[in-house]
């Protein structure tokens, strides 16, 4: 994965969830539950962004690769040729 193809989604998703968490509370109507709704919006933005970030970083540098037996590797190679 090149630096450009990784940086663009990170910038886009960071901007999106930043807008949801920062600009979203400005559009909540006044009422008795306004504080609860704002808290829910900010918590949702933070949780969704962290979930996405952890998932994309785990795919970027995995801790271990697929565990294949030699017979499986030879069979796959035979089928692909």
Curated annotation (Swiss-Prot):
Glycans are attached at residue 70. Isoform 1 is expressed at high levels in heart, brain and kidney and also detected in inner ear epithelium, vestibule, testis, epididymis and bladder. Isoform 2 is expressed in heart, kidney, placenta and pancreas. Isoform 2 is not detected in frontal cortex, but is prevalent in all other brain areas. The keyword rRNA-binding does not apply. GO terms for molecular function: ATPase-coupled ion transmembrane transporter activity; proton-transporting ATPase activity, rotational mechanism. GO terms for cellular component: clathrin-coated vesicle membrane; endosome membrane; lysosomal membrane; membrane; phagocytic vesicle membrane; synaptic vesicle membrane; vacuolar proton-transporting V-type ATPase, V0 domain. It is a multi-pass membrane protein. It comes from the Eukaryota. The chain crosses the membrane at residues 8-28, 36-56. V-ATPase is a heteromultimeric enzyme made up of two complexes: the ATP-hydrolytic V1 complex and the proton translocation V0 complex. The V1 complex consists of three catalytic AB heterodimers that form a heterohexamer, three peripheral stalks each consisting of EG heterodimers, one central rotor including subunits D and F, and the regulatory subunits C and H. The proton translocation complex V0 consists of the proton transport subunit a, a ring of proteolipid subunits c9c'', rotary subunit d, subunits e and f, and the accessory subunits ATP6AP1/Ac45 and ATP6AP2/PRR. Subunit of the V0 complex of vacuolar(H+)-ATPase (V-ATPase), a multisubunit enzyme composed of a peripheral complex (V1) that hydrolyzes ATP and a membrane integral complex (V0) that translocates protons. V-ATPase is responsible for acidifying and maintaining the pH of intracellular compartments and in some cell types, is targeted to the plasma membrane, where it is responsible for acidifying the extracellular environment. This is V-type proton ATPase subunit e 2. It comes from Homo sapiens (Human). The gene is ATP6V0E2.
């Amino acid at each position: 994965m090149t630096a450009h193809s990784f940086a663009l989604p990170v910038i886009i998703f960071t901007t999106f969830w930043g807008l949801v968490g920062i600009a979203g509370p400005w559009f909540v109507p006044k009422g008795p539950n306004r504080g609860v709704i704002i808290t829910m919006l900010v918590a949702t933005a933070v949780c969704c962004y962290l979930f996405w970030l952890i998932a994309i970083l785990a795919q970027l540098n995995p801790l271990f690769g697929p565990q294949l037996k030699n017979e499986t590797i030879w069979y796959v190679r035979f089928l692909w040729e």
